[in-house]
A protein has these predicted regions:
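A detector for small-residue-rich transmembrane helices and their helix-helix packing motifs
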Residues: 1-159
Length: 159
C-alpha cells in the first residue's frame, strides 16, 4: 500500500511541472540536465493523465532497484539516440515495466499480453511518439526481468 501512496504523490507532483515541459524535453541540442529529467515532464494534462494511469497499473512492481534501473536505462537511451522531435514523458519508464512484466503476462494471462502488444503497435502508429525509445526500454525491461529471475534462482541454488 505504501508504494501506491508514493506513486500517487509522484504522479501529482509531475502535474505541477507540466508548464516546464519545454525546458525538460530531450532533443539534439538540449542541455545536459534534460537527459536526467525528461521522463518527469509532460506536454499537457492529457499526456500526464494517460501516463499517470499507466504508472498506476504497474505500481505493484515498483522496487527501488527496478525504478533505478528503468531511470538509468532511459537516461542512457537519451544519450545514444536523438530523434528529430523532442522527447518528453514517463512513458519510457512505463515501457520498461511493460517489458519487465511481459513474460509473466504471456505465461499466466495471455490475453493481457496480447492486449499490451496491440496497444504498443497502435501507439507506434500515432504521430509524435518516440517509438525507438519505447521499444528499447521495453526490451531492456524484458532483459532486466530475465536477469533478476536468474539471480533469484541462482541464490536459491547457492551458486
Amino acid at each position: 500500500m505504501r508504494t501506491l501512496y508514493i506513486t500517487l504523490l509522484i504522479i501529482l507532483l509531475m502535474a505541477f511541472i507540466i508548464p516546464l515541459h519545454a525546458s525538460l524535453a530531450v532533443y539534439p541540442s538540449s542541455p545536459l540536465y534534460t537527459h536526467f529529467a525528461y521522463m518527469f515532464g509532460h506536454a499537457n494534462f492529457i499526456h500526464w493523465g494517460i501516463n499517470g494511469w499507466c504508472i498506476l497499473m504497474f505500481h505493484h512492481q515498483f522496487r527501488f532497484h527496478r525504478l533505478l534501473a528503468a531511470w538509468l536505462c532511459s537516461v542512457l537511451v537519451s544519450f545514444i539516440y536523438y530523434p528529430a522531435l523532442p522527447v518528453l514523458g514517463a512513458s519510457v519508464l512505463i515501457y520498461f515495466f511493460m517489458g519487465f512484466s511481459a513474460q509473466w503476462y504471456y505465461r499466466y494471462h495471455r490475453i493481457y499480453f496480447w492486449q499490451m502488444m496491440l496497444g504498443m503497435a497502435i501507439g507506434f502508429l500515432l504521430p509524435y511518439i518516440a517509438g525507438i525509445f519505447h521499444i528499447v526500454l521495453f526490451c531492456l525491461g524484458f532483459i532486466y526481468a530475465k536477469a533478476e529471475r536468474f539471480i533469484r534462482h541462482a541464490n536459491t541454488l547457492n551458486i
